[in-house]
Amino acid sequence: MTAQTTAPALLTLDVEDWEHANYSQLDVSSVAAARKGRNYAMDQNTDRWIEICAGFQASSTCFVLGEFARRYPEAGKRLHSAGHEIASHCDTHALVYEMKQEEFRENLKRGLAAVGDLTGVAPLGFRAPSWSVSPTRTPWFFEELARAGLRYDSSEFPVWTPLFGRFGAPVVPYFEHGVLRVPVSVIQFLGMRMPFSSGAFFRLSPFWLLRAGFSSVTARGLPPMIVLHPRELDPGHPRLPIAGWEGQVHYARMASV
């Protein structure tokens, strides 16, 4: 009989509601129409997250959207009281690279205030909605994080996809403008980088790939990062009007979580 050990992982939750998404098929009116008449309470899923983590004596970092914090303030307080770190996911789910620097500064300021009001503590971390930052389109990004007093960022997706990410981005933590960057975990597979533990990739990855990914990242001396969303804890949540591959990315294998 051999002893089994478990390696630490970075468990993270992007705390947002079911309609917070960025796809070409969506606009303000279509999202508003989808939400009209829906009384779904996403805070039941953050409470479920607390229960799951408590069952494994685990804590997580929760990147809370300002809009969510104002809509469900008690949910954020319960996450904090349960020992989860509360960080910022910006104020709205707008794409950062579509904002001007001043717009982002104000959006970030509102988001930090909303989250800080929940805990009485200034957040130290940030993750951009849909990983929407890049050196070319948001060259001022870290200047603004540092200005706001943030210590670390988890907006780096080191694989290009049609929705986000970039080729050649570092896969290990590094500092930029005094802010620690913590990239999403990836695995080398058939000579290519492959994400496996974040959102849709976590849901779509077979168990053998998840296991290989965790082992590969751990062997490099790094803790694997897991990224989930409250909506992924309930396959029955309301749906947005998105079809095709975007709909598959957003909803495929929801029950697998």
Annotated model-derived regions:
Residues 36, 127, 194-204:
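Surface-exposed cleft-lining segments at the edges of enzyme active sites
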Residues 1-190, 208-257:
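Catalytic alpha-helical scaffold of carbohydrate-active enzymes acting on polysaccharides/glycoconjugates
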